[in-house]
Amino acid sequence: MWNALQDRDSAEVLGHRQRWLRVGTLVLALTGTFLIGFLFGWFIKPSNEATGNVSHSGMKKEFLHELKAENIKKFLYNFTRTPHLAGTQNNFELAKQIHDQWKEFGLDLVELSHYDVLLSYPNKTHPNYISIINEDGNEIFKTSLSEQPPPGYENISDVVPPYSAFSPQGTPEGDLVYVNYARTEDFFKLEREMKISCSGKIVIARYGKVFRGNMVKNAQLAGAKGMILYSDPADYFVPAVKSYPDGWNLPGGGVQRGNVLNLNGAGDPLTPGYPANEHAYRHELTNAVGLPSIPVHPIGYDDAQKLLEHMGGPAPPDSSWKGGLKVPYNVGPGFAGNFSTQKVKMHIHSYTKVTRIYNVIGTLKGALEPDRYVILGGHRDAWVFGGIDPQSGAAVVHEIVRSFGTLKKKGRRPRRTILFASWDAEEFGLLGSTEWAEEHSRLLQERGVAYINADSSIEGNYTLRVDCTPLMYSLVYNLTKELQSPDEGFEGKSLYDSWKEKSPSPEFIGMPRISKLGSGNDFEVFFQRLGIASGRARYTKNWKTNKVSSYPLYHSVYETYELVVKFYDPTFKYHLTVAQVRGAMVFELANSIVLPFDCQSYAVALKKYADTIYNISMKHPQEMKAYMISFDSLFSAVNNFTDVASKFNQRLQELDKSNPILLRIMNDQLMYLERAFIDPLGLPGRPFYRHIIYAPSSHNKYAGESFPGIYDALFDISSKVNASKAWNEVKRQISIATFTVQAAAETLREVA
């Protein structure tokens, strides 16, 4: 079990500290008047131990210079030789390899942290597929059972066939209904405007726009008895680019795997809220959290063509329902003309199993503030080879660990403790990170400074993409001004310059875009449940010209090392840039005397979010007046927060940094600010999402929503049966948000 207080290698780590403690004990025994002097010496004078007589900027320069593109390339190659599905021997072997290498790199402590969680696998003897059957029940078409292997991988075993993880077993048959992206608004269009019911039908939807788990939830609410997911060329095939292996587009037989859970931050479905260790109480499977109730299966667009080409019913309501296949995209239900007697049948035989998973946790102890933790984490498990997701991120983490280890071997420790994590079972619902955070939640809430996520390093090669708490805005802006841009046409210019020009903020003129944190990745439990300041960075595509969802080969067998080397980043300059950004964020958070958090950026963001949610509410002016809904209290709280944050920053500028007590007080105020936005009761219906300012959208887990309690209360409010009850809930959520913002402001006031 990971224990941050273990004393391995203590002679090296704490020798200097113990000498001062012995002196301090003697002094205290003589007189208490030397206590303050002792504390000053403890916090300030031993700084040479952390830096080896090298300045902060010099140490950072040395750290960044140590990061090498060729190492990241080598690590990526090594991590993508075989599949690393969670719960398999291959992934366990990779965990042990990373464990051993992190020890070689010089970390003080590296451990494997295991949990027994519910996972889902396809049945090897009864494969999953979809068929079209005639009136006699005979199959006249069936979908592919697997993808064609990419060149060079024909003899690789243990490639899991395409499936939707956690789908229940079942063989439903019936008429097909095309539901576009299966978003909430798509079902509203079908049911309210087109008067088409999905009850008792099998629905087919194209991937994109929203998280697949939300798609399945919407289908269940609409009464569907089964769901088919596919990747449409309009969303996963860029014009003028060839399909893999000749290009980076998705072949017709390529399929996106993925889980279809709706956990809402619960972690392991059998142990929601608590770590899935040997002592855990486990719910029966029938009471598990977040499992879908209808069979679900993914297919490629070649097979989707066969299912959609003879659809009957009305034409698509508008062009946004048409994809890139040569089919009419009729909605159904059922097939037309001579095919009207044919039905669709699903054959789903996947099973769930409690399986052991392994995180790798590495510790680099801080020299001066060992009880303050900065965490860098990314997952290791992959659906198949994981050339981009996750191993492009895992390779970067590996190189960052190596660089910090090199500095440590030279006697240059960080000021604060850095924890490095290789998470398992992220693809199955963020299970590895969530279970570990649940087990150590009290410690993390007390000592966690920040969490930096390190999943896929690239999803394109156009510009930087950052999602983070407003506390980190200034940190990210400042460090990107110090890094060189890898982009063509920006030689000699900073990363900030290219980022600002290619991805300008729609909210703040003259600044690069920074997005809100949603979910779908391992920062979720740290940010949404524990209130630890979080952020992530990667290189992305040009979203203005490249309209496809994510990158085309996402979660397919074709996501290989060769995909990255041939098409995305041949020189690994973008990987190196991402390593520099992630590494510099960790470095600054772990080494800055004053934590590099900016509470005034939070104040600006709160004002923007309050204005936005108010404008949404004013789409219903009559109801706002009738039910006496007012945002005055929220605006007042935001104004108070803004005033207090400004005064806090002024005190911070005047802070005597040689005073360890005052320094610790103000750093703690900064560290705990994110925690102040946490409501222990959570959001309505989503108790593990506890951040009142940010949460994943209820309608798309990938997207972040501000003031989510108010937003959800206002969503589709005109259709609520009990209008008075609905508007009272809006009033209640405004009250909760007001209290939370005001309470957060109180934490920034000068300590009496």
From Swiss-Prot:
Quick one: where is this thing mainly located?
membrane
The cellular component terms of Gene Ontology attached to this UniProt record, alphabetical and capped at eight, are: cell surface; membrane; plasma membrane
Where in this protein does the record say Phosphoserine is found? 10
Co-factor(s):
Zn(2+)
For region NAALADase, the annotated ranges are 276-589
Q: Kindly list the residue ranges recorded as spanning the membrane.
A: 23-44
GO molecular function per UniProt: Ac-Asp-Glu binding; carboxypeptidase activity; dipeptidase activity; metal ion binding; metallocarboxypeptidase activity; peptidase activity; tetrahydrofolyl-poly(glutamate) polymer binding
Family annotation (SUPFAM superfamilies): PA domain, Transferrin receptor-like dimerisation domain, Zn-dependent exopeptidases
Q: Name one GO biological process term.
A: proteolysis
Q: Where does substrate bind?
A: 212, 259, 426, 519-521, 536-538, 554-555, 701-702
Q: What is its EC number?
A: 3.4.17.21
- EC class (word): hydrolase
User: Organism's domain of life?
Assistant: Eukaryota
Catalytic activity, as annotated: Release of an unsubstituted, C-terminal glutamyl residue, typically from Ac-Asp-Glu or folylpoly-gamma-glutamates
Q: Name one Pfam family in it.
A: Peptidase_M28
The note on the cofactor says:
Binds 2 Zn(2+) ions per subunit. Required for NAALADase activity.
Instruction: Summarize where Zn(2+) 1 binds, as residue positions.
Output: 379, 389, 455
Report the domain remarks: The NAALADase activity is found in the central region, the dipeptidyl peptidase IV type activity in the C-terminal.
Q: Which family does it belong to?
A: Belongs to the peptidase M28 family. M28B subfamily.
Q: Tell me, in a sentence or two, what this protein's role is.
A: Has both folate hydrolase and N-acetylated-alpha-linked-acidic dipeptidase (NAALADase) activity. Has a preference for tri-alpha-glutamate peptides. In the intestine, required for the uptake of folate. In the brain, modulates excitatory neurotransmission through the hydrolysis of the neuropeptide, N-aceylaspartylglutamate (NAAG), thereby releasing glutamate.
User: How does the record describe its quaternary structure?
Assistant: Homodimer.
Task: State what protein this is by name.
Answer: Glutamate carboxypeptidase 2
